[in-house]
């Protein structure tokens, strides 16, 4: 049975687009943690769910963990992870690396971290109404800057994809897993 692989990285880096292209190349199904979350939440969007929870991401972060638990026995999938998959909230509501989620993710899949320069990501996300709102306290820029070292440290392979075409990113990923 083929091994799973997971794509992690900040919002807007291209994880979903790259995972869909990888699926076309390999025939492996894509499993999106965000899409499973929407299903588990009864079909409401992530922004609506966060709004219903008065801006509190804790319940959503717990749901992400439960999704990873359900995927533990999956084989031969491409896991398209939401941008916050590596994180939980501490008792004060501050985002912190989640050892429970990180350990589980690494037991499920070979992890590929994807990154682009922060300015490119900020520009892409700023006015995208399909993206969940980020905390009023933290700007997207500071969230990305705080998360990047964790994406890098958790990744089995870390790719700076800057201006690479989707096909080139897929080629690099497939080369690493010797597909």
UniProtKB/Swiss-Prot annotation:
Transmembrane segments: none annotated. Catalyzes the specific phosphorylation of the 3-hydroxyl group of shikimic acid using ATP as a cosubstrate. Pathway: Metabolic intermediate biosynthesis; chorismate biosynthesis; chorismate from D-erythrose 4-phosphate and phosphoenolpyruvate: step 5/7. Pfam families: SKI. GO terms for molecular function: ATP binding; magnesium ion binding; shikimate kinase activity. Monomer. GO terms for cellular component: cytosol. ATP binds at residues 12-17, 131. Keywords: Amino-acid biosynthesis, Aromatic amino acid biosynthesis, ATP-binding, Cytoplasm, Kinase, Magnesium, Metal-binding, Nucleotide-binding, Transferase. It catalyses: shikimate + ATP = 3-phosphoshikimate + ADP + H(+). Its cofactor is Mg(2+). This is Shikimate kinase. One of its GO terms (biological process) is aromatic amino acid family biosynthetic process. Substrate binds at residues 34, 61, 83, 147. It is found in: Cytoplasm. Mg(2+) binds at residue 16. Binds 1 Mg(2+) ion per subunit. SUPFAM superfamilies: P-loop containing nucleoside triphosphate hydrolases. The keyword Kinase applies. HAMAP family: Shikimate_kinase. InterPro entries: P-loop_NTPase, Shikimate/glucono_kinase, Shikimate_kinase/TSH1. It comes from Leptospira borgpetersenii serovar Hardjo-bovis (strain JB197). Belongs to the shikimate kinase family. Its EC number is 2.7.1.71.
């Amino acid at each position: 049975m083929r091994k799973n692989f997971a794509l992690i990285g900040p919002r807007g880096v291209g994880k979903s687009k790259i995972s869909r292209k990888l699926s076309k190349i390999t025939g492996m199904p894509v499993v999106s943690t965000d899409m499973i979350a929407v299903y588990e939440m009864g079909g409401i969007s992530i922004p609506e769910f966060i709004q219903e929870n008065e801006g509190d991401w804790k319940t959503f972060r717990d749901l992400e963990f439960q999704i990873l638990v359900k995927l533990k026995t999956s084989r031969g999938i491409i896991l398209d992870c939401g941008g916050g998959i590596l994180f939980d909230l501490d008792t004060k509501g501050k985002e912190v690396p989640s050892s429970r989620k990180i350990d589980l993710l690494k037991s499920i899949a070979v992890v590929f971290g994807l990154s682009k320069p922060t300015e490119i990501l900020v520009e892409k996300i700023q006015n995208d109404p399909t993206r969940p709102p980020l905390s009023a306290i933290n700007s997207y820029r500071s969230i990305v800057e705080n998360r990047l070292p964790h994406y890098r440290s958790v990744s089995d392979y870390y790719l700076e994809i800057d201006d690479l075409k989707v096909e080139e990113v897929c080629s690099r990923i497939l080369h690493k897993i010797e597909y």
